[in-house]
Amino acid sequence: MHNKIAKRKPAAKGSTVRPMKEQRAKDHSFAPIDMMGAKKTGLRTQFAALCYRLRKGKPEILLITSRRTQRWIIPKGWPQDGMRPAQSAAIEALEEAGVEGKLHDFSIGIYSYTKNHVSGRALPCVGIVYPLKVKKIHDRYREVSQRKRKWFSLAQAAHKVSEPELAHIIRNFEPNKIQNA
């Protein structure tokens, strides 16, 4: 397979095509991650847990802050040897958010983002999201002093995260459709 990049034709006079940044801000369109100059192994995969609970019949999503930038995110991490992807996501939920629960072993979506590595390199990543119904919340856990955690409604959580694809996954999350799965 060849790495050919399609060149965008200029917009026709009077068209409504807007630059991606402006369009994304208005309608949360999905923009591809920047793979310019990436090598065969350039795209990294992380496994993420969408931690949820039901309060008065309505779903709430647990978000945590990132360690360096304090952005609202969901727990996620690198694949772990000998574990299924969903198990890796559950381990991250425990370490980063201090929660355990009923793990669903199927993905509910994939989102893209750029991870700013400690080396200063920007790593293009995809996060594969697994739902986890929270049953137990720990007061003490590995990263308690490094992160904040907070419950949000679906709409609030979708608004708080900065990745448009993740916001879409959260906004459209329907836990009642996975209860018996």
Regions from the PLM with identified roles:
Residues 54-60, 118-122:
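Short, solvent-exposed loop/turn segments that connect beta-strands within catalytic domains
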Residues 57-100:
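Conserved Nudix-box catalytic region and its N-terminal flanking loop in Nudix hydrolases
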Residues 2-56:
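Acidic, metal-coordinating catalytic segment for phosphate/diphosphate chemistry
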Residues 110-139, 150:
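Active-site-adjacent beta-strand/loop module that shapes the phosphate/pyrophosphate-binding cleft
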Residues 4, 70-71, 136-181:
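Nudix hydrolase/Nudix homology domain
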Residues 99-110:
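A short coil-to-beta-strand element that immediately follows conserved catalytic motifs
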